[in-house]
Amino acid sequence: MINIPTAILCRLGARSSISRSFGTSIVTKSEAKTPIQKFGWEYLLKQRSKNRPIAPHLTVYQPQLTWMLSGFHRISGCVMAGTLLVGGIGFAVLPFDFTAFVDFIRSWNLPCAVTAVFKYIIAFPIIFHTLNGIRFLGFDLAKGVNNVGQIYKSGYLVSGLSAILALAIVFNSCQNKSNKTA
């Protein structure tokens, strides 16, 4: 059987050794111990006085078509995947289905110009992601990756075709809507 004073001393001893180990690992600004820590702290203070960001920021990099298309490809893929996930779960759980949702939107009788904007916002990322995915598959096959001019031409082609095809889909949709009402 352990007596109470021993248990208290053991707990206090353990607690003080733990607090001692945590206390020595934390370096505050006033007690930098090594020359490297002093240099690092002075460097951060100097950067702060010049209103510079601590880490590299996107404003440091020059905008280039290659990384912008790559970023938009990733973003459009994530947004579409999230939309399918949330929409699929939502329509599985909610008491109405997708067709009822579409009929509800159609019951608002919005003008074609308003629906065209929303249709373009939906169509462009889908078309862009598809065409840019085909472009990236070509890069995976090492087609055109050693020619920077070819990379830029294919990027402009994907961007232009995506915009044109999305406009064609939206225009065709508005034409079909006006033909049905006439």
From Swiss-Prot:
Localisation per UniProt entry: Mitochondrion inner membrane
CDD domains, sorted: SQR_TypeC_SdhC
UniProt key word S-adenosyl-L-methionine: no
Disulfide bonds listed in the record: none
Transmembrane segments: 65-94, 115-139, 148-169
GO cellular component: mitochondrial inner membrane; mitochondrion; respiratory chain complex II (succinate dehydrogenase)
Keyword Lipid metabolism included in the entry's annotation: no
Mitochondrial intermembrane compartment spans: 95-114, 170-172
Primary localization: mitochondrion
Cofactor dependency: heme
Record-linked SUPFAM superfamilies: Fumarate reductase respiratory complex transmembrane subunits
Reported function: Membrane-anchoring subunit of succinate dehydrogenase (SDH) that is involved in complex II of the mitochondrial electron transport chain and is responsible for transferring electrons from succinate to ubiquinone (coenzyme Q). Mediates resistance to enteropathogenic E.coli infection.
NCBIfam families linked: succ_dehyd_cytB
Stated name of the protein: Succinate dehydrogenase cytochrome b560 subunit, mitochondrial
Organism: Caenorhabditis elegans
Lineage: Eukaryota, Metazoa, Ecdysozoa, Nematoda, Chromadorea
Name of encoding gene: mev-1
